[in-house]
Amino acid sequence: MTILFQLALAALVALSFLMVIGVPVAYASPTNWEQSKSLIFVGSIAWTVLVIAVGVLNFFVI
């Protein structure tokens, strides 16, 4: 269970870092917004799922 928690936490940190860089770039360029809209929404959903998963796994690890 600890390994799964660590992998989920690493994925959350990596996705957070990518979204901190990618979302402002997508919002700043008007031509990229139409192309990046679905990717931003999927990333947001994945981030939310990872936050919940890390919280649940934290309950089982500690």
UniProtKB/Swiss-Prot annotation:
Q: How does it sit in the membrane?
A: Multi-pass membrane protein
Gene3D superfamilies in the record: Photosystem II PsbZ, reaction centre (1.10.287.740)
InterPro entries in UniProt = PSII_PsbZ, PSII_PsbZ_sf
Q: Kindly list the GO CC terms recorded for this protein.
A: photosystem II reaction center; plasma membrane-derived thylakoid membrane
The UniProt entry lists the main location of this chain as: membrane
- Signal sequence coordinates: none
What Pfam families does the database record attribute to this sequence?
Ycf9
**Compartments (UniProt record):** Cellular thylakoid membrane
Question: Subunit structure, per the record?
Answer: PSII is composed of 1 copy each of membrane proteins PsbA, PsbB, PsbC, PsbD, PsbE, PsbF, PsbH, PsbI, PsbJ, PsbK, PsbL, PsbM, PsbT, PsbX, PsbY, PsbZ, Psb30/Ycf12, peripheral proteins PsbO, CyanoQ (PsbQ), PsbU, PsbV and a large number of cofactors. It forms dimeric complexes.
Function of the molecule: May control the interaction of photosystem II (PSII) cores with the light-harvesting antenna, regulates electron flow through the 2 photosystem reaction centers. PSII is a light-driven water plastoquinone oxidoreductase, using light energy to abstract electrons from H(2)O, generating a proton gradient subsequently used for ATP formation.
Q: Which family does it belong to?
A: Belongs to the PsbZ family.
Task: Return the protein name.
Answer: Photosystem II reaction center protein Z
- Organism expressing this protein natively: Picosynechococcus sp. (strain ATCC 27264 / PCC 7002 / PR-6)
Q: Which gene encodes it?
A: psbZ
